[in-house]
């Protein structure tokens, strides 16, 4: 009988630990599709699943729940990922929580509603932010003066304003192109 207990004990603890998370690495060596990786994280949040953002761990990696749907979507989008066991996740989280490390695990719970302050006539390639969000497959809404003046900012969790609005970069652009026919035409529209 004692041998049976020993055998059961060995069998129980020799079974491989099942994976519980998908690690989306964000370091330059491991991830070829950084922007798409942000997109899959947003997509996961839209599915009302929580994500852990591992700040300063392998470039700010993400931990997503281990589901077949997420793995398939990562493959479709060309995103590098690693399936990790519970013990490996515990090891990573212990490292991150160490006071000697400049790292943090932040739980993301909701896909933010994103607005980009930009003229309506712009194409995604006219604006680096909208181009990145479009490529990453992160949904956003373009708003401009009319939406701001009619209190529609309340509909969004995140508003992106371009840095040139504050640094004078638009002034350089205006000085260079204010007399260009295409610029004059766009301003009239």
Model-found features: residue ranges?
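Sec-dependent N-terminal signal peptides
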Residues: 3-16
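A short, charged/proline- and glycine-enriched loop
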Residues: 18-19, 107-114
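Helical hinge/lid and interdomain linker segments adjacent to catalytic or ligand-binding clefts
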Residues: 22-32, 63-72, 115, 119-189
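Short, flexible, solvent-exposed loop/turn segments with mixed acidic/basic and small polar residues
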Residues: 14-15, 49-56, 103-107
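Short N-terminal or domain-adjacent regulatory/targeting segments
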Residues: 77-110
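Short phosphate-binding/catalytic loops that engage adenosine nucleotides
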Residues: 49, 79, 138
């Amino acid at each position: 009988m004692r041998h049976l207990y020993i055998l059961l004990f060995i069998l129980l603890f020799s079974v491989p630990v099942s994976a519980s998370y998908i690690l989306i690495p964000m370091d330059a060596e491991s991830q070829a599709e950084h922007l798409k990786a942000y997109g899959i994280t947003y997509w996961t949040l839209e599915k009302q699943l929580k994500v852990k953002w591992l700040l300063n761990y392998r470039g700010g990696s993400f931990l997503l729940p281990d589901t077949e749907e997420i793995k398939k979507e990562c493959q479709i989008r060309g995103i590098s990922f690693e399936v990790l066991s519970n013990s490996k996740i515990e090891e990573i989280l212990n490292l991150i929580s160490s006071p000697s490390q400049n790292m943090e695990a932040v739980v993301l719970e909701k896909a933010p509603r994103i607005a980009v302050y930009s003229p309506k006539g712009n194409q995604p390639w006219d604006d680096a932010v909208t181009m990145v969000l479009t490529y990453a497959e992160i949904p956003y809404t373009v708003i401009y003066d009319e939406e701001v003046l009619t209190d529609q900012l309340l509909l969004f969790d995140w508003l992106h304003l371009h840095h040139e609005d504050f640094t004078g970069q638009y002034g350089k652009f205006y000085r260079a192109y204010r007399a260009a026919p295409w610029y004059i035409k766009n301003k009239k529209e």
